[in-house]
Every structure is written in structure tokens, then in C-alpha cells.
């Protein structure tokens, strides 16, 4: 795989040739309901300093998350492990693509240290895709979970994983480490995979989530999608059914925002009332929790949502017992 610089936006960020050679797409003006404040608070600065001092990477920065100001002000951050270079070139994603560096053996300890420094009660850990590794990075995920458990036993752990495609036994390694929440995003409906997520397979991702529940039914499972990529409403409803058939507990739905002209265009901006309807429908389909709004992202309000998940499961068990 060759790594090139995308000089079109003069950012100096590493890009896979496929991204650099894509035709420019118009970037639509965002509607008023997607406006966010610039990150300038004291809490934001303190979080950034902790991240920098521990030489950590966050998906908040790498993916250009619109909620970074709100989350970092509250000293919430989603740590991205195994480097900042991904082996895939998804059309929606702003993370750099190329040949990754070797794993940092000190990363589990550094993540655990940051969790303790920030006083996190709930931490979200994600990663780039590492197709170059024999286990896809599963063992490294497990080591990070173990380190956080030892440093901050009271902190609940949520992971957002790649699909471990063609990595036999990888999922079992991660599940054995017993995260509290296992998140793997479908990202979009199956008809859009060839253009949006060409390196992945929709039904493999569904099966991955189902397998987590088979291995350990106590782990909460979660998945998210973006809308505004040209999908049809009935495709979203079918995707919900697919997730429920895999016994997924929690679904997130947010608006796709185009990072640069080289990325997949926004086909439309979905209005807030339509997001609300997805939330209502999702709950009737049996999800314990559905978060659906223009600015919803996988890790947004993750700590609060974990508390809601626990309460919803307890209420469900109580209703079955009565």
C-alpha cells in the first residue's frame, strides 16, 4: 500500500491514493440545527493537555467530531488505540490511511494513567483498523482493558471495535477481557457499502455483534449508523430489524458530515423530527436504548447512556419476573 499526501486541502494529513484521487464533491452548507460552539473552555484545554502529555490519540480530533468542545469541556474523550493510521480508506472517514506504525507497548499503561487523571467513571476506547496484524489488534484491545481495570476498577469500559474481518479467534480475545459495552458500528445500510465502506461486509458486522452476545450475554452491545448518505428510510428500518435479530441493545443514529471535498458527499441533511421518529420506531422494535439526533455520535454522552442502559435492562428483567 502506497501512502501519499493529499495536498488539495493543504492539511498535510496522510491519505490513501484512493482518497486523494477521488473527484471533488461539493460540501453543502450546514443547516442551523447542526451549528456547534468553538471549543475554547478551560476544561477543553485541560483535557487536551492530559491527552498530549500521555502521547495519546483521540478519535475526537482525528475524525473531526463536532462534539469535541462539549465533551472535552466535561473531560470526556474517546481514546483511539493502535496509532492514528488506518489500513482502510472508507469514503466517509477523516482518519489517515496508509501503512501503520508498530504498536506502542506502553499504550495500555498510558491510557490507564489518563483515565485515572481525568477521573473518568466511563471510558470509551476505539481504534483504527489494523488489517496488517494477525489478530487485528485484538490482544492489544484486551491489554488496554486490563490496564484500565487495574488502574481504575470503578470505571466502566466501552469499546468501539473494527470488524476483525478474516481474523479468526480475534473477537473471542476481546470478549474474554469483558468490556462493559461492546460497540461495532454498521455505519450505513448494506446498499451503500460498496461506495461508503468497501473494505467491510455488512452481514459479517451483524454476525460479529450477534457473536458477542453468544459469548457473553451480560455485555451490552451497541451499533451506530450515519444518515444523509443517500439511503432510503425503509432501508434504515430493515437495518434496525437486522440489529435486533442479533440482539443488539443500543443503537445510535446521527447525521453524516462530509470532512473534505474528497469524501462522500452529503446527499441530504435529515431534519430533527425525522431523527426523533427513528428513536420512537427503534424503541418499539425492542432496543433498550436509541440515541437519534443530528449530532449523535457513537461516544456522545456515553457515560449517561450507560446508566440508562443498565436501568432499562433492570426494568426489563423486573417486568419479566412479575
From Swiss-Prot:
- Pathway info: Protein modification; protein lipoylation via endogenous pathway; protein N(6)-(lipoyl)lysine from octanoyl-[acyl-carrier-protein]: step 2/2
Chain sites annotated for binding [4Fe-4S] cluster 2: 86, 90, 93
Q: For binding [4Fe-4S] cluster 1, which residues are annotated in this chain's numbering?
A: 60, 65, 71, 299
Keyword annotations for this protein, in alphabetical order, are: 4Fe-4S, Cytoplasm, Iron, Iron-sulfur, Metal-binding, S-adenosyl-L-methionine, Transferase
InterPro entries, alphabetized:
Aldolase_TIM, Elp3/MiaA/NifB-like_rSAM, LIAS_N, Lipoyl_synth, rSAM
Q: Give the residue ranges for region: Disordered.
A: 1-22
Location(s), subcellular: Cytoplasm
EC class (word): transferase
Q: What region holds the Radical SAM core domain?
A: 72-288
Q: Which CDD domains match?
A: Radical_SAM
Note how many cofactor molecules are bound and how.
Binds 2 [4Fe-4S] clusters per subunit. One cluster is coordinated with 3 cysteines and an exchangeable S-adenosyl-L-methionine.
Instruction: Cite the record's Polar residues compositional bias ranges.
Output: 1-12
EC assignment: the record states 2.8.1.8
List required co-factors: [4Fe-4S] cluster
Q: Known SUPFAM superfamilies for this protein?
A: Radical SAM enzymes
Family, according to the entry, reads as follows: Belongs to the radical SAM superfamily. Lipoyl synthase family.
PANTHER family per UniProt: LIPOYL SYNTHASE, LIPOYL SYNTHASE, MITOCHONDRIAL
NCBIfam families, per the entry:
lipA (TIGR00510), PRK05481.1 (NF004019), PRK12928.1 (NF009544)
- Name under which the protein is recorded: Lipoyl synthase
**Which species is the source of this protein?**
Brucella canis (strain ATCC 23365 / NCTC 10854 / RM-666)
Gene this chain is encoded by: lipA
